[in-house]
């Protein structure tokens, strides 16, 4: 039990992501208990609503997130990506584990931006706990 976070890729022709057609998507990113990153998605993608729903992510939104991750890591400034409280969300400490997660997420998001065929696919974020 805990915060599990996913980005999935789905062919645009297959329609929006839903419980009924989830099997038609591919997981392209996964994080466990990285509550600071989840908080960013809730505030910037989910309009402040933390409801375990799936939300489409644009290339521009990923660029915004990449900028936050790069600045936070370069400046070692956790205020750019603050820990987010929640039930079974993991540690709220800003320690080496946190910075390792920021660096890993930065690399993952950069790869998603570069490697996604944006004409053919949509990306969606969702989390469960």
Model region roles, listed by residue range:
Residues 1-129:
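Acidic (Asp/Glu-rich) sequence patches and key acidic residues
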């Amino acid at each position: 039990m805990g915060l599990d976070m996913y980005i999935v890729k789905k062919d645009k022709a297959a329609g929006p992501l839903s419980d009924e057609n989830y099997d038609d998507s591919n997981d392209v990113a996964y994080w466990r208990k990285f509550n600071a990153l989840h908080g960013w998605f809730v505030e910037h993608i989910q309009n402040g609503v933390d409801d375990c729903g799936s939300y489409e992510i644009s290339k521009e939104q990923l660029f915004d997130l990449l900028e936050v991750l790069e600045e936070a890591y370069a400046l070692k400034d956790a205020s750019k990506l603050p820990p987010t409280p929640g039930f079974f969300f993991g540690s709220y400490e800003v320690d080496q584990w946190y910075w390792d997660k920021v660096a890993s997420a930065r690399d993952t998001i950069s790869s998603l931006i570069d490697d996604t065929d944006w004409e053919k696919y949509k990306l969606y974020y969702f989390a469960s706990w």
